[in-house]
A protein has these predicted regions:
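Intrinsic-disorder/low-complexity, polar/charged segments enriched in Ser/Thr/Lys/Arg/Asp/Glu/Gln
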Residues: 7, 17, 55-61, 133, ...
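Hydrophobic ligand-binding cavity/cleft-lining segments
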Residues: 9, 18-110, 203-206
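Beta-strand/loop substructures that line and gate deep hydrophobic ligand-binding cavities in soluble
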Residues: 38-42, 138-195
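A short, structured loop/turn motif at beta-sheet edges
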Residues: 65-69, 127-131, 147-156, 197-202
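Hydrophobic pocket/interface hotspot
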Residues: 71-74, 125, 157-159, 193
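Glycine-centered loop/turn motifs
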Residues: 104-121, 126
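Short, hydrophobic/aromatic-rich segments at coil-to-beta transitions
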Residues: 112, 127-136
Length: 206
């Protein structure tokens, strides 16, 4: 009887997990993957797309009440060991607070420079056009583009990740496990950039 009860419990657990996973993949994940982005932004080609063809992608965006040239300095200084990620610093910046101002000595970002995600790891800058876009990544793992598009009322900051994973049970499990966390961190980053840029604009106008 104990064995039967254990098997029934296991079956119920597996079924419950399958239902939750299916619901997440069908309704939650699509919303996460395009948070804040319009249909046009989701389907538009962006710099860096060619680095990783036939890849899974996310496109997220936010409107910032400032000109692209006022947003750009905050992008070129981001990264671990630099200005931080403007996100949850206790997770991605060793607890050090992300910069709340533009740091002049961090503005000279060049092609080939590494943007660290953590100690010793991170993609290299592959392309950039000041005040327009910044692309980092490689052909093996993935690419990341931050684009600044002028819009009514300011700038649309659009972030696109493209990743090609080998299709194995381990990678599928890892993607499903890390996907919600990546969304939470990136949304916080986009909101953090917006708050800093708009706060700086208010401060300079005062």
């Amino acid at each position: 009887m104990r064995l039967l009860g254990a098997l029934i419990g296991l079956a119920v657990g597996v079924l419950g997990a399958a239902i939750v996973l299916t619901a997440y993949r069908r309704w939650v994940q699509p919303w996460q993957h395009r948070w804040g982005a319009t249909d046009e932004e989701v389907w538009a080609a962006m710099p860096g797309d060619e680095l990783v063809p036939a890849a899974a992608s996310t496109t997220r965006a936010i409107t910032i009440a400032a000109a692209p040239e006022d947003v750009w300095p905050w992008l070129v200084q981001l990264g671990y060991g630099r200005a931080g990620w403007y996100s949850y610093d206790w997770i991605d910046n060793d607890g050090r607070a992300s910069a709340d101002h533009v740091v002049p000595e961090l503005q000279d970002l060049q092609i080939g420079d590494q943007i660290l995600m953590g100690p010793g790891m991170g993609p290299a800058v592959r392309a950039m056009e000041p005040n327009r876009y910044l692309v980092a990544g490689d052909r093996e793992g993935g690419s990341w583009c931050l684009a600044l598009n002028p819009a009514a009322g300011g700038t649309r900051l659009v972030s696109r990740w493209r990743v090609r994973w080998p299709l194995t049970p381990a990678t599928v499990f890892w993607v499903l496990l890390s996907d919600p966390g990546a969304f939470v961190m990136e949304r916080r980053m986009l909101k953090g950039i917006k708050a800093r840029v708009e706060g700086a604009a208010v401060g300079s106008a005062a």
